[in-house]
Amino acid sequence: MKSYMARPGEVERKWYVIDAEGKTLGRLAAEISRLLRGKNKPQYTPHVDVGDFVVVVNADKVEVTGRKAEQKVYRWHTGYPGGLRERSYRQMLRKRPEEILRQAVRGMMPKTRLARRQLKKLRIYAGPEHPHAGQTPEPYEVR
């Protein structure tokens, strides 16, 4: 008996909507990365994109444990000399709450071309509304 290998044309994708309100950042990001990669499906194949689309709402209400709210710092470099920038978790939550969750999910994905393509199937919104009602996303409960 041969092993099953999924082909890109025969993959059936679903849309899931996840409410991030009151969820822990890391646990939520781990579950989202599993869905994006397709590891929840029996036809998972490492070199084929078999993952689903994920819509996250209420990203501004995600929680962190311990003292991360005061101590966590996001750093990046602009590419110019002296261009190291940093923002605290609280500043990021105020200015760009979607980016907190996007960076957490990105850190849990492999650093490959396939993972970058899979990350494009992630849609994050700060509030409770999203424009993807036409795709009829199923609610997905994160444990």
Curated annotation (Swiss-Prot):
UniProtKB keywords: Ribonucleoprotein, Ribosomal protein
Record carries keyword Ribonucleoprotein: yes
Superkingdom field: Bacteria
Gene Ontology molecular function: mRNA binding; structural constituent of ribosome
Example GO biological process: negative regulation of translation
GO CC list: cytosolic large ribosomal subunit
Gene3D superfamilies: Ribosomal protein L13
Family stated for the protein in its record: Belongs to the universal ribosomal protein uL13 family.
Function: This protein is one of the early assembly proteins of the 50S ribosomal subunit, although it is not seen to bind rRNA by itself. It is important during the early stages of 50S assembly.
Quaternary context: Part of the 50S ribosomal subunit.
NCBIfam families, per the entry: rplM_bact
Protein name: Large ribosomal subunit protein uL13
Species whose genome carries this gene: Rubrobacter xylanophilus (strain DSM 9941 / JCM 11954 / NBRC 16129 / PRD-1)
